[in-house]
Amino acid sequence: MTTSLTIANRQTWFGHGSISQLIPLLTAEPQPTLLFSCRSFLNGAVYSSLADELTPLLLGTEIVSHEASPQEIDAWVARWRGKVRRVVAIGGGSVLDAAKAFAALVEHPLPTLRYMEKIGDTKISGATLPLIAIPTTAGTGSEVTQNAVITDTQVSKVKASLRHNNFVPHTAILDPQLLQGSPDKVLAYCAIDAFTHLFEAYLSKTANAMTREMSLTGIRHFLQAWPALNRSAEALEAIMQASYLGGLTLSAAGLGVIHGIAGEIGALRDYHHGQVCGRLLLPFLELLAKSEQPQQRALMAELAARLFPEQHDSPERYLIDFITRNAIASFWQDDLPISADELAVTLAKSNSKNSLIDYSAPQRQQMIEGAFRIE
């Protein structure tokens, strides 16, 4: 049996209203604290209710509007090095990843690019500031992962991570009320990203009985939440649990070919990562339905027996139908082009990650052409 390591937060608060724990956490151990957030949260009602108590506890605020670049992280480090001893992140996956990267690199001497996977030349240490992660979306699971994703679409054309076990946030606060009011597209894009994490981790060659059980639990939460994301408090609670479990399982078991492709497209095009994954998921399910790989067939049979035993169609085609029929936003219908040159670059750089099959370039091309319009 494959051995896995699961690393989680020291503290994880969960439930409606749990953001009320933030002020007591900060006042219990006063330290110079920097907030990373996004305009949608800072302009919202929850922040308004916290601002009078929170603002005096902060040195300042950095606003994140997209996936952070190495240059932006270096600028934050230069501005705050030696002044900050704790970080709070309130926002979506891009905000949390930016804060995780800053918390680590403010404790390292070299520029961000030197430590990044794929292109860096220096091993990153585990030095990092304590981080309180509070997601306002449910997709990346960044509040419990060991990596921070950094995207440079301008200079190095790379999307890669900083990674160390110590980069799991010290504390996570999972408050489903923070998802309320999110646009349907954001809810759907993030939720399908959470599903993709869970599904790829379930099918990973490095998964084991424990990680697969967590994946199945997360997928069950996703199936419950998906049709009702914009109309049910219970659905928001379920998708937040799915996202968290997706973060745990991807960290323990790894991801597959969908993310092996999505990361390379993300380095070339500023498309929402969750939408990219969702669009690649559908042709991947078609490919998977035709697979004769014994372990894939056994795992899909178990998934179907556990989660939708009354269905008699192939589990892959059931999932395609369920996802597309019940989506609150049609993530697969927008016109998202990539050029022929970008297709060639993506095929050259992408890989199957921890998939049970090493997918060939023609198979990966089939997925990409099924997900995007080639210009």
Where are these regions (language model features)?
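C-terminal charged capping/lid subdomain of soluble metabolic enzymes
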Residues: 166, 302-375
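C-terminal catalytic subdomain
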Residues: 253-311
